[in-house]
Amino acid sequence: MAGETTKLDLSVKAIGWGAADASGVLQPIRFYRRAPGERDVKIRVLYCGVCNFDMEMVRNKWGFTRYPYVFGHETAGEVVEVGKKVEKFKVGDKVGVGCMVGSCGKCFHCQNEMENYCPEPNLADGSTYREEGERSYGGCSNVMVVDEKFVLRWPENLPQDKGVPLLCAGVVVYSPMKYMGFDKPGKHIGVFGLGGLGSIAVKFIKAFGGKATVISTSRRKEKEAIEEHGADAFVVNTDSEQLKALEGTMDGVVDTTPGGRTPMPLMLNLVKFDGAVILVGAPETLFELPLEPMGRKKIIGSSTGGLKEYQEVLDIAAKHNIVCDTEVIGIDYLSTAMERIKNLDVKYRFAIDIGNTLKFEE
């Protein structure tokens, strides 16, 4: 009859790890996902990444976490079931899921492959609800059911345990660099910070055929930046002489420092006319701009990427052998891992071995 709503079939039993409240205490959480629809893909989760965003969401830092909360916006696994109208995947395929599991599909952003800017997104990690009334729980769980449009093809030669952080750190740095044209050969890009975001930014810059200069607070990271990640140069951000010599030489800089602590005038001074400062380190306070003219330089931010960009990140990583430095952990180590993230004690990202350590029992 007109006006009636179809009751959603929430019959897929699932177990995940998350929080029941803002105390931050992590625990197993049982819940139900919807039965696969015609265009849905059912995924056995094998790996799930953990980052600072997850830690802050667990503690409701921004005030919009809905409990019980199962985190996870960097998820990799294999297809175990497909709906009858699914065209992109078959059982056994390796796949990934990023931060989005749905969007309106009608707005300007959705129509232009920028689903991440949709005003009505369905996020993977439990911060939103579907139109039908289904709660979305994150990928730190044994199973996911996702519309095939929001499922990513996983390249065969990209290890899932080393690649799963690309679904966060990778797309966060790739999307704005591509937008600014920094994916072209010959660009000189400065990277502030050499953590999870910075290390991936350097690898992508080199894959693009560019020159990467790492600017860090610690001289101890010089060997690591050059020998492990392929940076062309390294500068300590307190070395005024070196910084002076670099003024106006860079096509852009990417600030990946936690909390966006790098002074804006310092970054603007390094950038050429028409260059750009890209902020991906989630600034926690307002930044100050210099009063003098900025030479038509741009300051931009980033909010992950669209689905096309997500797939490009995985494909480029596979083509250029880009992997993340991950510490693979079991689910029982998760609380310790969150504390280590809080204390900046991880090199560089955690990947949870969901497939072998998260057991589902009826």
UniProtKB/Swiss-Prot annotation:
Record protein name field: Alcohol dehydrogenase 13
Subunit relationships: Homodimer.
Example GO BP: alkaloid metabolic process
Gene name for this UniProt entry: ADH13
Chain sites annotated for binding substrate: 73
Record EC number: 1.3.1.-
UniProt-annotated binding residues for Zn(2+) 1: 51, 73, 168
Enzyme class, spelled out: oxidoreductase
InterPro entries referenced in this protein's UniProt entry, alphabetically: ADH-like_C, ADH-like_N, ADH_Zn_CS, CAD-like, GroES-like_sf, NAD(P)-bd_dom_sf
Nucleotidyltransferase recorded as keyword: no
Binding site for NAD(+): 193-198, 280-282
GO molecular function: oxidoreductase activity, acting on the CH-OH group of donors, NAD or NADP as acceptor; zinc ion binding
Binding site for Zn(2+) 2: 104, 107, 110, 118
Cofactors named for this entry: Zn(2+)
Organism domain of life: Eukaryota
Cofactor note: Binds 2 Zn(2+) ions per subunit.
Keyword terms, alphabetized: Metal-binding, NAD, Oxidoreductase, Zinc
Pfam families: ADH_N, ADH_zinc_N
Coiled-coil intervals, chain numbering: none
Family: Belongs to the zinc-containing alcohol dehydrogenase family. Class-III subfamily.
